Amino acid sequence: MKLNILRLLVVTLACASAFVVITKVRAEKTASSITPTLPQPAQQPAVTAAQQDKPTEQVQKNIKVLTGLPQWQLIPVMNYMAASMGRRCNYCHVNNNGQWDYASDDKQEKNTAREMIKLVLDTNKNTFKGNVEVGCYTCHRGRSQPQSIPALPLPVPSPGGGQRPGGGGPPAQGPGQQPQAQPSPSASPAQPTADDILNKYINAIGGTAAIDKIKTRVMKGSMATANGQTISYEIHQTAPNKAYELFTTQRGSMERAVNGETGWEKNPQGVHELVGQPLADLKLSLQLFRNIKLKEQFTRLRFGGRDKVGDREAYVLNAGTADNRRERLYFDAENGLLLRRVTFTQTIVGVIPEQIDFEDYREVEGVKLPFAIRVSSVDPGNPISTRKFDEIKLNAPIDDSKFNMPPKAATP
């Protein structure tokens, strides 16, 4: 017991400068992300698609403690560390007049970070049997230095709402007093099953017959980022496994598509075929029925209690997939609509969440669909982005050539 406590105390220092070396990389999102990878500054050329599944030490320079981390997880892990400490890249990395030297070890903060990451890895390995129970956020909670002393004054407990100082249980009885009757707990309402919740959702959005009529979907609108930038966005989807999306920004445009088992991306740096984890991510996120036919996506579903999403009471489902991805789904307890979807990506230094909120449901040809989708992530540069659609069309014709990969530019 003392050993466990000691290790947990040690971890309060963990990730104090938790950034490691990155050299010129482009952000790739987590496995369930629907947030776009936007064109990156010229200073950060893209890592090739073939490199994304390689260990990061085979792609980047001077990686010392995150050996074995897949390259595609590197940017999400960096974002997780930054969010955990409320810091940005320059806390650990060298920037000379706007030029990043990610491989440099000149800053002591980065060297300290390596030691702290080792402590996190060791604690999870030796205390929690290899499970990732402790991460940077465990202690930092958005601060560069963990707070180890309680802040005074402490919150005042509500009358009758807490235990007596020094222990729990009912109040002590005086001499000759009879024990006071304790109120019996109120009966808990019957818990719905996972099937109850999912069936109610299907009926709420229009029913199986209406859903099965959907063959294509075209959505057009805009995406607002956390820094106030507005990006034009559109997506074209054909069942069962084709999709194309276009982002238009002030810096240019970006296209991404899935055509069955293949995928590609076109940005200002050129056309790239997607393979490995980035392709799997895109195939998952662009599925036409991704947020409609939920039951088929999971091998494990169980009721997770009640919660609130905004001012709405919600039922929660804890879900798991065949490849051990975990998600949490929130459904409006009254009308049955899907309100929120939280996905979790496990890495060697912590579990990275992403939250997707669905709002402004409207009926389109007999099916209710959200016209606003808000994505919250641990990306410090864009923690919240909101997509709002001006139009959604079902079963509109889509030219199949839209999903084909464009020819690559000739090499000079």
Feature-to-residue mapping (PLM):
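N-terminal mature ectodomain segment of secretory-pathway/periplasmic proteins
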Residues: 196-271, 296-308, 321
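Gly/Pro-enriched, hydrophobic low-complexity segments
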Residues: 250-252, 310-409
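Short, conserved active-site entrance elements at the starts or edges of catalytic domains
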Residues: 281-318, 337-340
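Edge/loop elements at the starts and ends of beta-strands within beta-rich repeat scaffolds
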Residues: 190, 210-215, 228, 349-351, ...
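Sequence context surrounding c-type heme c attachment/ligation sites in exported
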Residues: 32-197
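An anionic, turn-rich surface loop/hairpin at beta-sheet edges
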Residues: 103-113, 277-285, 346-357
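Sec-dependent N-terminal signal peptides
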Residues: 1-28
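Acidic/charged, solvent-exposed loop-and-adjacent secondary-structure segments enriched in E/D, K/R, S/T
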Residues: 264-290
